């Protein structure tokens, strides 16, 4: 492989893995299987090792996790919640053992093996035995404050058996029986069901209303002690015993092993026992038990050297493929999906499986009526692995992708260097509908109450066809729709009205310009400050911006060189939709003498003008430090709407409190 090709492939893999990380760790909405993610990661690691000149500090191969959403308050972990390196077979486990023994110069080593619970990783903070704060893992450094929701989980003690100050870490999960019951209720109510227990747990814990989490019958296993004051515990196994004595729920199926052979035997044992548990596990975690040896081995930027996660092979089952259904995405890509005779895979009933594209169907010679092997290695629609040719009867039908769009009957095209067929009709109803769903999504205009179901209702009723149509909706129209009452209709109209005040970057991202993600949208918004200035920009001006490449620049210029788009922007203006950047430029804050220099600040509640992540960046650019909890060392609390318990903590510690208006005044000095 030439250096040029290697560089291009490395960049492609980084973009791909960053997208997968964001979908999995931030949105709780993964789009690929664990196996596919791992394949791409291993390819990237190999290419970077072979081409060290292309190594980058921000490569997915060396960093932890993704970005945190501006929904809950931010919490900075006192020590990073690192991810673990992976082992996929016995050889990987033996390599891990060899590295450990080399790193400790022949000292005796004992391992502790634990079941890897498939849930949501959280940290729990206790002061003098009282539960004061819980947070998600987030990107490993900064998580989200989910204290109130965690308090609804009965397995989490609100008061410990000793008045000790500590941070424990664990995995919140939904038992299988609770998952089945929840999905049955959602089906009866006509709601979308959860794909699996992990998604159900994550979705429940990240609800803004703790009452919803309380109804979901979640549980939790604590798997580690991050720190504890005035106490030294020499081994991980003893720390788990200590946590159990304090009142935490720890998993009883852990085992200490003196040799790697014992570790391998434990892995094989639980691979067999796995289906009989009432909770999902996706592997085994193996750790060096001795804490002193852990400290000696240390960590890499991404994971500890003293621990590894063995990942179970994807579960594979056989079922019959009864048909192939096509869907059209917002960019026009036509994706085939296999329709299957229902079969249980990895704890859920599966009726559909991804076929990705026409090339895959041809490569695997998939035909309607075939018996196929299906696997589900992660949290997504499963994939067809292969056909069982021995079961063919001769009655199976070969499948050919259509030449015309299934939604609008326009001719399909295959763009250069793409394997997917694409509908390029800008009036295709399927693309319009998917585009509307994207426009109102969390990272775009973030219109609460406008999800896929409601957008589909509005679209089918012919109430909306363009983004601007959303701002012409009336309460009377909503009341004509199923499951809308006076209150819900009023709330949705208000949510749509509120979205008019969003900063420019949200609108830009919502437009769905090809190649422009949320990060690029913010870059454009901060650089040009208004939509009008961006519309006038040339390709050369766009390419001159840091991190904006030729492909993206061309896409932006092409998008705005369209009369329909310009008409849409004019309609936005008429409806009063903001098209200016409301943020404060980071670059303008550098080297400025500021009140915030050397100050410790806590942000709480909803900030209307900027998200808390942006406020944090501004404070840090001015020399301040942002923390997630109020203490006697805190200098200032900035309180937005619906500020919670941190106000009481500020009063207790006699800390000054500002509202958002006062905060912005100080920033703008």
Swiss-Prot record:
It comes from the Bacteria. GO terms for cellular component: cytosol. Zn(2+) binds at residues 405, 408, 423, 428. Gene3D superfamilies: 5' to 3' exonuclease, C-terminal subdomain (1.10.150.20), 6.20.10.30, BRCT domain (3.40.50.10190), DNA ligase/mRNA capping enzyme (3.30.470.30), Helix hairpin bin (1.10.287.610), Nucleic acid-binding proteins (2.40.50.140). NAD(+) binds at residues 34-38, 83-84, 114, 137, 171, 287, 311. It catalyses: NAD(+) + (deoxyribonucleotide)n-3'-hydroxyl + 5'-phospho-(deoxyribonucleotide)m = (deoxyribonucleotide)n+m + AMP + beta-nicotinamide D-nucleotide. InterPro entries: BRCT_dom, BRCT_dom_sf, DisA/LigA_HHH, DNA_ligase, DNA_ligase_AS, DNA_ligase_CS, DNAligase_adenylation, DNAligase_N. Residues 591-669 form the BRCT domain. Its EC number is 6.5.1.2. SUPFAM superfamilies: BRCT domain, DNA ligase/mRNA capping enzyme, catalytic domain, Nucleic acid-binding proteins, RuvA domain 2-like. It holds the Pfam family DNA_ligase_ZBD. PROSITE patterns: BRCT, DNA_LIGASE_N1, DNA_LIGASE_N2. SMART domains: BRCT (SM00292), HhH1 (SM00278), LIGANc (SM00532). The active site is at residue 116. Its cofactor is Mg(2+); Mn(2+). PANTHER family: CHROMOSOME TRANSMISSION FIDELITY FACTOR 18, DNA LIGASE. DNA ligase that catalyzes the formation of phosphodiester linkages between 5'-phosphoryl and 3'-hydroxyl groups in double-stranded DNA using NAD as a coenzyme and as the energy source for the reaction. It is essential for DNA replication and repair of damaged DNA. This is DNA ligase. The lineage of its organism: Bacteria, Bacillati, Bacillota, Bacilli, Bacillales.
């Amino acid at each position: 492989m030439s250096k040029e090709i290697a560089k291009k492939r490395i960049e492609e893999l980084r973009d791909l893995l960053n997208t997968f990380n964001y979908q999995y760790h931030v949105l709780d909405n993964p789009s690929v299987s664990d196996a596919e993610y791992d394949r791409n990661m291993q390819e990237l690691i190999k290419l970077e090792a072979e081409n060290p000149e292309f190594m980058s500090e921000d490569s997915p191969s060396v960093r932890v996790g993704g970005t945190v959403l501006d929904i809950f308050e931010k919490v900075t972990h006192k020590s990073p919640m690192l991810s673990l390196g992976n082992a996929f077979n016995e050889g990987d486990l033996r390599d891990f053992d060899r590295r450990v023994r080399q790193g400790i110069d022949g000292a005796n080593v004992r391992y502790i093996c634990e079941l890897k619970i498939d849930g949501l990783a959280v940290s729990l903070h206790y002061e003098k035995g009282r539960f004061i704060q819980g947070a998600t893992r987030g990107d490993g450094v900064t998580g989200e404050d989910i204290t109130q929701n965690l308090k609804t989980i009965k397995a989490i003690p609100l008061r410990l058996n000793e008045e000790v100050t500590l941070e424990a870490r664990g995995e919140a999960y939904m038992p299988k029986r609770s998952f089945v019951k929840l999905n049955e209720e959602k089906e009866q109510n006509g709601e979308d069901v959860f794909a699996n227990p992990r998604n159900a747990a994550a979705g429940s814990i990240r609800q803004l209303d703790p009452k919803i989490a309380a109804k979901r019958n979640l549980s939790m296993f604590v798997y580690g002690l991050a720190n504890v004051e005035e106490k030294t515990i020499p081994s991980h196994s003893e720390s788990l015993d200590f946590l159990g004595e304090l009142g935490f729920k720890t998993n009883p199926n852990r085992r200490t092993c003196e040799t790697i052979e014992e570790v391998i035997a434990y892995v094989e044992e639980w691979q067999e026992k796995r289906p009989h548990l009432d909770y999902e596990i996706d592997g085994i975690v193996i750790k060096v038990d001795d804490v002193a040896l852990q400290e000696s081995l240390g960590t890499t930027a991404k994971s500890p050297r003293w621990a590894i996660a063995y990942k179970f092979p994807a579960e594979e089952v056989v079922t019959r493929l009864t048909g192939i259904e096509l869907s059209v995405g917002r960019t026009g890509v036509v994706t085939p999906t296999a329709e299957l005779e229902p079969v249980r895979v990895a704890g859920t009933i599966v009726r559909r499986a991804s076929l990705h594209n026409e090339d895959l169907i041809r490569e695997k010679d998939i035909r309607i009526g075939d018996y196929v092997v299906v696997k589900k290695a992660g949290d997504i629609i499963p994939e067809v692995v292969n056909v069982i040719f021995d079961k063919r009867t001769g009655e199976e039908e070969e499948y050919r992708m259509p030449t015309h769009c299934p939604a609008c009957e326009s001719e399909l095209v295959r763009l250069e260097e793409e394997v997917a067929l694409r509908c390029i009709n800008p009036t295709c109803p399927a693309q319009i509908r998917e585009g509307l769903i994207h426009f109102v999504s969390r990272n775009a205009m973030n219109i609460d109450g406008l999800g896929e179901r409601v957008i589909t209702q509005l679209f089918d009723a012919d109430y909306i066809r363009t983004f601007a149509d959303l701002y012409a909706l009336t309460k009377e129209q909503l009341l004509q729709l199923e499951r809308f009452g006076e209150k819900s209709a009023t709330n949705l109209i208000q949510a749509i009205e509120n979205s008019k005040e969003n900063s420019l970057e949200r609108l830009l991202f919502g437009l769905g310009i090809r190649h422009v993600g949320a990060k690029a949208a913010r870059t454009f918004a901060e650089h040009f400050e208004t939509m009008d200035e961006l519309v006038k920009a040339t390709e050369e001006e766009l390419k001159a911006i840091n991190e904006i490449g030729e492909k993206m620049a061309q896409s932006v210029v092409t998008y705005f060189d369209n009369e329909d788009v310009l008409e849409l922007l004019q309609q936005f203006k008429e409806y009063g939709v903001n098209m200016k950047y409301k943020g404060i430029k980071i670059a303008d804050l550098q080297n400025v003498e500021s009140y915030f220099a050397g100050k410790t600040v806590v942000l709480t509640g909803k900030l209307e003008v900027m998200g808390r992540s942006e406020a944090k960046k501004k404070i840090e650019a001015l020399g301040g430090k942002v923390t997630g909890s109020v203490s006697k060392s805190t200098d200032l609390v900035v309180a937005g709407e619906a500020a919670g318990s941190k106000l009481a903590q500020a009063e207790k510690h006699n800390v000054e409190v500002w509202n958002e208006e006062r905060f912005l005044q100080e920033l703008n000095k």
